[in-house]
């Protein structure tokens, strides 16, 4: 199975002090045959969050290096999903502005035979990363 990690799941996986790091890391370890995925939106979101949020305090260069190390450490498990979806691919459940990116990512994952892996139970048609 391919799991496109949303920004929050990607940040939690990469930052050991994140409140959900153990949850995401345990899930990843429990599914060694699963393929993890990123895309331009999730990678850029990862950089933005880690460079902008005071809790992380990383520069853009440091955040980029962390993401590259994460992907290299699990090279056989990470793939990059190219994004060729336009707005016609948005799921019908997208009704509000806050749902647009989540809907797009869910559609991108589904279009590549996978699921959007998230910590947010409010996003329909996704895979909710379980608590350990």
Predicted regions and their residues:
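Short, well-structured N-terminal submotif of metal-dependent ribonuclease cores
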Residues: 1-38, 53-65
């Amino acid at each position: 199975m391919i799991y496109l990690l949303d920004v929050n799941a990607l940040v939690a996986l990469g930052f050991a002090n994140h409140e959900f790091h153990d949850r995401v890391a345990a899930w990843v370890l429990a599914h060694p045959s699963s393929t993890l995925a990123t895309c331009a939106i999730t990678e850029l979101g990862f950089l933005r969050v880690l460079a902008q949020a005071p809790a992380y305090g990383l520069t853009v260069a440091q955040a980029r290096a962390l993401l590259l190390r994460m992907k290299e450490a699990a090279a056989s498990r990470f793939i990059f999903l190219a994004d060729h979806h336009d707005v016609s691919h948005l799921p019908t459940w997208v009704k509000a502005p806050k749902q647009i990116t989540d809907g797009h990512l869910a559609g991108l994952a589904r279009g590549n035979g996978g699921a959007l892996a998230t910590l947010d139970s409010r996003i329909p048609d996704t895979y909710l990363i379980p608590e350990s």
